[in-house]
Regions:
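Active-site and donor-binding regions of nucleotide-sugar-utilizing enzymes
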Residues: 6-31, 36-200, 302-303
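Catalytic binding pocket for nucleotide-activated donors in carbohydrate/polymer assembly enzymes
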Residues: 301-375
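Conserved catalytic-core segment of nucleotide-activated headgroup transferases in glycan assembly
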Residues: 197-270
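Well-ordered, non-membrane alpha-helical segments in soluble/globular domains
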Residues: 20-21, 64-72, 93-100, 233-250, ...
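Short, hydrophobic beta-strand segments that form beta-sheet elements in well-ordered domains
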Residues: 35-37, 112-113, 167-171, 258-264, ...
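C-terminal alpha-helical cap of glycosyltransferases
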Residues: 370-412
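Donor nucleotide-activated moiety binding/catalytic core segment of transferases
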Residues: 66-74, 193-196, 260-309, 313
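Short, flexible/disordered intra-domain loops and linkers
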Residues: 46-52, 124, 222-239, 324-327
C-alpha cells in the first residue's frame, strides 16, 4: 500500500513550536511520510532566517531550499505529494513567491493554504485625521510602494502560471477572504485558530489562578518587522524598556500582581534581562495567561489567549510606534473590536490602571467567534479536523486514534 506523502512548504525556518502548530507530528504519527521544505530565503530574500543547525524531528524529512537550483529540484518532489501543505503564503501572490507557486501549480497535486489565524481588518479613521497629516502620510507611504507587488497581486492567476488553492484551512468566521490564490474553486476545511488549539491541549477553562499579570512580549525593539518596514526608522530601545518597567512597577505596587514576561520565541535574553530581573518564561504563553489576572501586550496575536480564557487585557503603545501609518490601523482595530483603549507609555505615571481589570464580555464573545473558533466544542484538535476534511475529499485515509508524540524533537 502506498504511504500518503505530505509535503510542507514553510515560509520561515521551522522550530520546535511548529511541530505541533503545523501538524507535523500529528501526520507523522498517523503513519504518513512527512517532508518539510524551508523556503524562507526564497519567499523573504531580504530577511536572514534564524535557524538552529541542530534542529531535527524524528521521522520527518527537513530540507532548506535557498537557491534557484534547489527550488527547481523541489518541483520533482512536489509531483510525488499526496497533498501539498503550502504554508509559505496565506494566499497573497508576490514577486518573491511566484516561482515557488508556479512549481506548486505545475505539480498537478492538490494544495492547501492555512488561513486559521485571522485578525481584525485594519481600521482607518481618515475623517478624524487632518488633511495635511493624511497627505504627509500618503506621500511617505508612496516612497515605499512596490509596483511589482501591486502588479503581481492583480494579474490573473493563469496569466502568471498559477492556479487557485484547492483547499483552505479556516479558523473563525472572518478567516475566509476571497483574494489571490483563494477563489470560488477553493474548498474550505473548518478548523480553528492555533491558539485555540493550544488551549485545547492544556485545558480550555482557567485553572490555578495566581496573582500575576503576563506581558506578551514581542521583542519589540528587535522585531523582524522593522527589517521589512523600511518606512519606520526604529525607536530608542532603552527608553522603551524604561517605560514598560515603570508600568510593571505600578502594576505590582497598586494592583498587587506579579508581572511575568511571556517571551517572544525569537527573543534573546541570555546576556541581559531588560525587564529589571523579572521572571522571563519561554514557550508557555497559554499556560501563563490561563493562570493570570491580567494580560498585557502591544499587539501580539497571543492576546487571543486573553479572549479564550476571558482575561482582562491591557494594550500598550507609545507615540513613535502607534503612529506608524502601516501599523496604526491594525492597533485601532484591536482596540475597537476588544473594547480596550490603548495605554500610552508616555502617560504611564498618571493612567488609571484599575480600569484595565474589566473586560466587555459581549465583545470578547464576538471576537472569539470571528477570529478564533466558530464551531461547537467537540474536543477535536485542529489537525484532526484537517485530517477529517482531507479524508472526506479522498486525499488521505481516515484518521487513526491516538495523539501525536512530540518528544522526538532535537535542537541545540
Amino acid at each position: 500500500v502506498k504511504v500518503p506523502h505530505l509535503v510542507y512548504l514553510l515560509g520561515s525556518a521551522p522550530t520546535a513550536r511548529d511541530v505541533g502548530r503545523f501538524g507535523l507530528a500529528y501526520f507523522r504519527d498517523q503513519g504518513f511520510r512527512v517532508s518539510v521544505f524551508d523556503v524562507a530565503e526564497i519567499c523573504h530574500p531580504r530577511i536572514k532566517p534564524s535557524r538552529d543547525p541542530n534542529f531535527s524531528i524524528s521521522g520527518v524529512e527537513l530540507k532548506v531550499v535557498s537557491t534557484l537550483e534547489e527550488l527547481a529540484e523541489l518541483g520533482g518532489v512536489l509531483r510525488t505529494a499526496s497533498v501539498i501543505m503550502c504554508f509559505a503564503t496565506e494566499g497573497l501572490v508576490k514577486p518573491e513567491n511566484t516561482k515557488l507557486l508556479r512549481l506548486v501549480a505545475h505539480s498537478g497535486r492538490p494544495y492547501v493554504l492555512l488561513r486559521s489565524e485571522a485578525h481584525p481588518a485594519p481600521l482607518h479613521e481618515q475623517g478624524k485625521i487632518p488633511l495635511p497629516t493624511r497627505l504627509a502620510q500618503t506621500i511617505k507611504r508612496l516612497r515605499y510602494v512596490k509596483p511589482t507587488h501591486s502588479v503581481a497581486r492583480r494579474l490573473p492567476l493563469k496569466f502568471n502560471g498559477l492556479r487557485p488553492a484547492d483547499y483552505v484551512i479556516l479558523g473563525g468566521r472572518r478567516s475566509l477572504a476571497t483574494s489571490g490564490l483563494i477563489t470560488g474553486h477553493t474548498q474550505p476545511i473548518y478548523g480553528h485558530s492555533q491558539d485555540y488549539d493550544q488551549a485545547l491541549k492544556i485545558g480550555i477553562t482557567p485553572d490555578q489562578i495566581t496573582n500575576s499579570a503576563v506581558f506578551l512580549d514581542q521583542y519589540l525593539p528587535h522585531h523582524r518587522d522593522w527589517q521589512v518596514l523600511k518606512s519606520f526608522p526604529g525607536f530608542d530601545a532603552d527608553l522603551y524598556y524604561r517605560r514598560v518597567n515603570r508600568l510593571f512597577a505600578r502594576i505590582e505596587k497598586e494592583l498587587g500582581l506579579k508581572v511575568i514576561i511571556a517571551a517572544h520565541p525569537r527573543a534573546d535574553y541570555e546576556k541581559q534581562n531588560p525587564f529589571e530581573g523579572r521572571e522571563i518564561v519561554f514557550g508557555r504563553p497559554a499556560e501563563l495567561v490561563r493562570a493570570c489576572k491580567l494580560a498585557i501586550t502591544v499587539s501580539s496575536l497571543a492576546l487571543n489567549f486573553a479572549v479564550i480564557y476571558d482575561k482582562p487585557l491591557m494594550l500598550i503603545s507609545f507615540a513613535e510606534h502607534f503612529s506608524i501609518p502601516e501599523m496604526n490601523p491594525l492597533f485601532r482595530a484591536f482596540s475597537h473590536e476588544l473594547g480596550v483603549p490603548y495605554l500610552f507609555l508616555e502617560n504611564v505615571e498618571t493612567v488609571d490602571l484599575s480600569a484595565y481589570l474589566k473586560r466587555d464580555a459581549s465583545l470578547y464573545q464576538d471576537y472569539r467567534a470571528n477570529y478564533l473558533v466558530d464551531h461547537q466544542a467537540d474536543g477535536l484538535s485542529l489537525w484532526q479536523r484537517v485530517h477529517l476534511g482531507l479524508s472526506e475529499h479522498g486525499l488521505l485515509p481516515a484518521p487513526q486514534s491516538g495523539q501525536p508524540n512530540q518528544d522526538n524533537i532535537k535542537h541545540g
